[in-house]
């Protein structure tokens, strides 16, 4: 039984896997880690191994608690990966992007896959049918665009994102919604079209916190999966058991 931990700036996600099957997922504030960690230990005493991925430095007490309880793998650029990484600067590659590519290798082996993660940033990552990671693109995320428009102008308001805005805005608020939401959706469709023309039988994975607000046509080759990153971390942990 594995414990997967994905640490963000404010929140921590935990997931328990057994035989590659997700048993439970939790999301809580970083300050509430120890309370939730104790509950997890009581509920799942069979956990033996854990993987930790964090975008920030975690409290040393938190790391020590994990090391004391389990065999801990901390994701970094030196960890063995289940794919060939051709990123020119692997030490700068985000851990979330690594996990997403690993999930693509696990779920869609032998296929060309484009993973789109709509989070703080919108990231595009491509792995080939030969299990080679080529890289991708990073674009400003939904919230970042709304906040930037408000911060770097004198009079434009900070607008709350809403799905499916009309194309032609008839007020400042609706114009901002149209420009940002529709603009991102056009970016998504255009990027998918460009990748699709270069890679045969391309499968697209659409994930991330803002994937529910944004909409792209879910054709046969496009799949939404909110647990894709956690599944990728678990696959990396399983892969390293054999190394």
UniProtKB/Swiss-Prot annotation:
Its cofactor is NH4(+); K(+). ATP binds at residues 6-13, 120. K(+) binds at residue 117. It is found in: Cytoplasm. GO terms for molecular function: ATP binding; metal ion binding; pantothenate kinase activity. Catalyzes the phosphorylation of pantothenate (Pan), the first step in CoA biosynthesis. This is Type III pantothenate kinase. It comes from Christiangramia forsetii (strain DSM 17595 / CGMCC 1.15422 / KT0803). The lineage of its organism: Bacteria, Pseudomonadati, Bacteroidota, Flavobacteriia, Flavobacteriales. The gene is coaX.
């Amino acid at each position: 039984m594995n414990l997967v931990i994905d640490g963000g700036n404010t929140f921590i996600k935990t997931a328990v896997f057994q035989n590659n099957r997700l048993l439970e997922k939790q999301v809580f504030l970083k300050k509430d880690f120890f309370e939730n960690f104790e509950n997890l230990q009581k509920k799942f005493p069979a956990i033996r191994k854990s993987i930790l991925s964090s975008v920030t430095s975690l409290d040393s007490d938190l790391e020590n608690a994990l090391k004391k309880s389990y065999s801990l793998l901390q994701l970094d650029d030196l960890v063995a990966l289940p794919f060939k990484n051709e990123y020119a600067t692997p030490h700068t590659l985000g851990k979330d992007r690594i996990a997403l590519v690993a999930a693509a290798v696990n779920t869609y082996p032998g296929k060309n896959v484009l993973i789109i993660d709509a989070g703080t940033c919108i990231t595009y990552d491509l792995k080939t049918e030969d299990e080679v990671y080529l890289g991708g693109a990073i674009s400003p995320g939904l919230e970042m665009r709304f906040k930037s428009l408000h911060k770097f102008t004198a009079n434009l308001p900070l607008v709350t994102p809403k799905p499916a805005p009309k194309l032609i805005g008839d007020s400042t608020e609706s114009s901002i919604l149209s420009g940002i939401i529709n603009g991102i959706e056009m970016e998504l469709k255009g990027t998918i079209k460009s990748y699709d023309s270069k890679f045969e039988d391309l499968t697209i994975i659409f994930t991330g916190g803002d994937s529910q607000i944004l909409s792209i046509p879910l054709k046969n080759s496009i799949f939404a999966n909110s647990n894709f990153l956690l599944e990728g971390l678990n696959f990396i942990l399983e892969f390293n058991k054999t190394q």
